[in-house]
């Protein structure tokens, strides 16, 4: 099944992290509270009994000579009547699963090729044309000297004589235990490539159109990125993404966010405006939360018992006017069972107290004399989200638990430039303990 009106692919994959000028807090400097469980059992209540304000405004909740902490936050809680813990099991990407997903982009697997060390004749000819054009340019327009270009051209003409006409078809065997990026295959449509690769011990899969994804709201320094015309409505994009996700080998995934973005090919030969439709693992209206790559997730301890055994289950679907042009699937899992009893949550007033205390712990290192010359930092909490967060099951690497959590999104502002570094702190909604939704090494302990 094809989920594109006119498939658009690109040459290569470029991963770009757009960082603010203000640097995030060094992990080695963070002080962590010693009390993992913050409240007594008799103070807890179910989600239906929990009283939660819509906003939290508190100026100067903590002030010192080196930092000021405040809150001006909206509080986002889905309309749910119950909340239960979930046990999920790993669902790594093996070859048969990858093929099923790949077939949503191509007519059949014969269109997918292995990446060869040797370029094809067509690829070499395209490179020759590009370098000859550069050679014909004026000297000030060239990136290299004529001698350097001619050396490259001579090598390309030599390789052209023995270059294969086509690439080998198929996909490479995927080593699900690989800790880094692992190439699987590529397909060519409209003379552009899309690369299929895996990451994170077989728990994530990217079918990525080439280029850099820039989200609306990106601060260029002299202006904010605004994306107006994508060519389809948000509802049309949602319908296309829903049909695509319904064909994936997944369970209990629901749309949790929509973002406008643009895909920029590195040489700026094309810009594709698109919607990024975000799906999270969901049960009875409560979902995992995607905070995006722009946020710094601060650690709890070096070997946190609340650290994630694999990434949160999140699917990003890239939809342009041509349909689905790519997807990223992190932390694939399947629901094993749902707890029969409802979660007992600490009151939100105690969540606020826990946030105040942990923020103070987190930035107390700035009082040290060695930071005397650093400008004061303003820390402002601007959003709090309620959702599931992944945590480990002690002694079982194939299982994980999804528990309710508060995602506290905030910014660090440095006076010297006024720019804010985004960060997020995650608190267990049942205990108030810090959580760490990042993938960690096997030697870190996990929660029971």
Where are these regions (language model features)?
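Segments that shape or occlude catalytic/ligand-binding pockets
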Residues: 238-416
